[in-house]
């Protein structure tokens, strides 16, 4: 239950409030005096009060402003004493208006700090924060009334330049710290020739080519075009063999990188010069290109110019037959190419088996690598030709491995003339009986390997006088094929098999040399009977003609 106050109770409470002390309103900013002493004084300071405060600060120093009232008997609060000393009684205070230099400094400081009056007063000795604030507020009102900008143009430009400089200094410092961190963990990768194996534009192997001279590798003609090829490969090998990091290795690394870039270009030139890229037709009237990379069934022989990746190859393989060399042959001939001893078996993989078709390049000046000229191959081929009359020869595979362009057969007008002549003399399919000496004469159980389609063999007319001089009663030797057989590829035409025949005519050897050194091997056709048709290479048209001789017995 609530107790209701009576009139007597209300009168007693009012009497107690009248007897309690009241705060002095005249005190200068201090809290109401609740003690038993006199009340604090408010209002402006008198000269007597200023003298008491100055004397106290000289004796006790600045600070502890609440003790002024106790020690001096001055009836002012601590806050009032501090402000009076800082704004009016300090000995280093500057009186009067601000100078032009002080005004310029205030504008610059305000553009950087804003309304930080105490911090700005620290940069202006003798000026108080209150004076700076009053000056700035007065200036803003004056500029607004006159329509002038608060900050002058010079101050704005200076501020923007300083900001950009600060940002650039920060970026430079950050980059420097990153460089120092990277320098502590410096890593230099090894540049090896193995990095170029996966590249379709590079060589299929990375041998130590220092053992192979340029003259033996590509001949004098190609060496003059890219004489810096061996130097670049040697530089790459030297970098790979280096064990430690030298202080001046940065210049060497830059040179190696530029050499590696040029090495890729030179490797493309090497591939084109050796004849691995594309082989053109020898007939000048035809522009059809026979791409590289067809597959031949039943051929695993060196006379096809193919290296087996499944069989190890030991020692140097010298693709040269001394008895068949000619002094006027092309120095870039494949017969002078010698494989380096450091060549490993696993490095003999044909890169075109897994690479896409490259862009057709210029016509190669090198002879076809199909004519290896090994004595064992000649003997074995002669034996196979005697027993291969009843064997079936498989058709050229339309494609090899992944990414390998299909094989293409290019026909020439001379081929049609030869076909018409053959049909008049011997009824039956022309291509089935026109089988050259090929590497396909080996067993058909051997797996197919990659091969190329060289240039076109051209047929030319032979005068009756020439036919008589070569012997009219003999026939041109060549293997027999059944009517149902398909002729093997003409790129493997081997006139070296003539040595295994029973003949002692010196012209046979001359004709074999002439046909062996021919660059442009082409269409499927064989020497035929009669006095009007014979083989002739487009690039070696001035060489002796092949004579007619009896078949193998």
UniProtKB/Swiss-Prot annotation:
Keywords: Activator, Developmental protein, Differentiation, DNA-binding, Flowering, Nucleus, Repeat, Transcription, Transcription regulation. Residues 1-17 have a biased composition (Basic and acidic residues). Induction: By gibberellin in aleurone cells. Gene3D superfamilies: Homeodomain-like. Residues 27-38 have a biased composition (Gly residues). Its main location: nucleus. It comes from the Eukaryota. One of its GO terms (biological process) is pollen development. One of its GO terms (molecular function) is DNA binding. Residues 65-89, 117-140 bind DNA. GO terms for cellular component: nucleus. Transcriptional activator of gibberellin-dependent alpha-amylase expression in aleurone cells. Involved in pollen and floral organs development. May bind to the 5'-TAACAAA-3' box of alpha-amylase promoter. PANTHER family: TRANSCRIPTION FACTOR MYB33-RELATED, TRANSCRIPTION FACTOR MYB65. This is Transcription factor GAMYB. It comes from Oryza sativa subsp. indica.
């Amino acid at each position: 239950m609530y107790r209701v106050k009576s009139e007597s109770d209300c009168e007693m409470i009012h009497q107690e409030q009248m007897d309690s002390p009241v705060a002095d309103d005249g005190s200068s900013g201090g809290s109401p005096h609740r003690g038993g002493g006199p009340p604090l004084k408010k209002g402006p300071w008198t000269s007597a009060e200023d003298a008491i405060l100055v004397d106290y600060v000289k004796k006790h120093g600045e600070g502890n402003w609440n003790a002024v009232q106790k020690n001096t008997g001055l009836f002012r609060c601590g806050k009032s004493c501090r402000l009076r000393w800082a704004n009016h009684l300090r000995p280093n205070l500057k009186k009067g208006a601000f100078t032009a230099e002080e005004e310029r400094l205030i504008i610059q400081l305000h553009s950087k700090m804003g309304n930080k009056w105490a911090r700005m007063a620290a940069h202006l000795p003798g000026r108080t924060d209150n004076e700076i604030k009053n000056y700035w507020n007065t200036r803003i009102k004056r500029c607004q009334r006159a329509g002038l900008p608060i900050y002058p143009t010079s101050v704005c430009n200076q501020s923007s330049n300083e900001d950009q400089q600060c940002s650039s200094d920060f970026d430079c410092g950050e980059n420097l710290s990153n460089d120092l961190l990277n320098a502590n963990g410096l890593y230099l990768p090894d540049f090896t020739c193995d990095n170029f194996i996966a590249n379709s534009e590079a060589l299929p192997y990375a041998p130590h080519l220092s053992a192979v001279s340029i003259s033996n590798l590509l001949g004098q003609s190609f060496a003059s075009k890219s004489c810096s090829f061996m130097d670049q490969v040697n530089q790459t090998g030297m970098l790979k063999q280096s064990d430690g990091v030298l202080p001046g290795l940065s210049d060497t690394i830059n040179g190696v990188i530029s050499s590696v870039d040029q090495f890729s270009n030179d490797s493309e030139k090497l591939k084109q010069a050796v004849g691995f890229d594309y082989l053109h037709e020898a007939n000048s009237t035809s522009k059809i290109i026979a791409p590289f990379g067809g597959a031949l069934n039943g051929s695993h022989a060196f006379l096809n110019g193919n290296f087996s990746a499944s069989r190890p190859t030991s020692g140097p393989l010298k693709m040269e037959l001394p008895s068949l060399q000619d002094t006027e042959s092309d120095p870039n001939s494949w017969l002078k190419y010698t494989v380096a001893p450091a060549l490993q078996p696993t490095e003999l993989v044909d890169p075109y088996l897994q690479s896409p078709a490259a862009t057709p390049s210029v016509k190669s000046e090198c002879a076809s690598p199909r004519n290896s000229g090994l004595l064992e191959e000649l003997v074995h081929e002669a034996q196979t030709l005697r027993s291969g009359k009843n064997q079936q020869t498989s058709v050229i595979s339309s494609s090899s491995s992944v990414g390998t362009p299909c094989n293409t057969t290019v026909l020439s007008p001379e081929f049609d003339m030869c076909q018409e002549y053959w049909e008049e003399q011997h009824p039956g399919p022309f291509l089935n009986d026109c089988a050259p000496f090929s590497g396909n004469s080996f067993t058909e159980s051997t797996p197919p390997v990659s091969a190329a389609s060289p240039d076109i063999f051209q047929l030319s007319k032979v005068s009756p006088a020439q036919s008589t001089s070569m012997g009219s009663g003999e026939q041109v030797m060549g293997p027999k094929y059944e009517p149902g057989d398909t002729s093997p590829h003409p790129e493997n035409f081997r006139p070296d098999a003539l040595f295994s025949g029973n003949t002692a005519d010196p012209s046979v050897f001359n004709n074999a040399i002439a046909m062996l050194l021919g660059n442009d091997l082409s269409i499927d056709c064989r020497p035929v009977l009669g006095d009007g048709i014979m083989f002739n290479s487009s690039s070696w048209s001035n060489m002796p003609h092949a004579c007619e001789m009896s078949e193998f017995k």
